[in-house]
Structures are given as C-alpha cells and as structure tokens.
C-alpha cells in the first residue's frame, strides 16, 4: 500500500491540486490496517457523508480522514496543509511562512502556526527534517 512506498513527486503534485485526492490519500494511510470505531470498537463501516470519512455500522459515529491526525481542526484546505507538510518533511526545504502565504494565498500567521505544528511533531519523533517519513506526520495525533 501507499504507506510502504515513497511519495513520488507526481503523486505529491496530484495531491496538492485537489482536496478530495488528499483526503482519500490520508484515509488510505490512516485506515491501512483496518477501521476501528473510536467510540464502540466495531470494525465494520460504510462510507461517510464527506470525502474519505468512515461511518461505524453499529453506533453510526462518523470519523473524518483528518480526525485525530496532524490535519485535525485545520481551517484551510487540506491540500494546502499537505503541501506545507510535504515541503517540510520530504523535501526538507526551509520555506518561510511569508513564502507559503504568497504561494498558497493564506494568511502568513496561519502558515506559520501550521509549519510550527509540523516542526513540533518532527521534534517529538526525534528526527531531523530529512529522516522523518511524512506518513509519521500524517498519523501523529495533535
């Protein structure tokens, strides 16, 4: 599955351009080992109302692909958040929040806070930017 493979530049560009593709990618990584409802522990699910979400067939609780991940409560498009995470973790680029703001059309402080969140995760896992897989970042509960 995608978790075991490197994220190619082509796949990354596809994810940067479309929030639905990004949500499906995150969902595939998040539930690679199967869905387990956080409320009741049931493993059967159906597709939820939003892209990439899953709904427990027992208690009907819906969990989004971004819930309990680095992208939880992200108030801007997930594809833009994924771009920031990708450039920090995979490419190891040290891009300023002002540059992210210009590139993505977001507020500078929004970019700064999200980049800070990613860097805190990198420090938490005890790795430098070059050595941490982006999948680790995606699955980190924040």
Show where each model-derived region lies:
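Residue-level recognition of single "structural anchor" positions
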Residues: 1-142
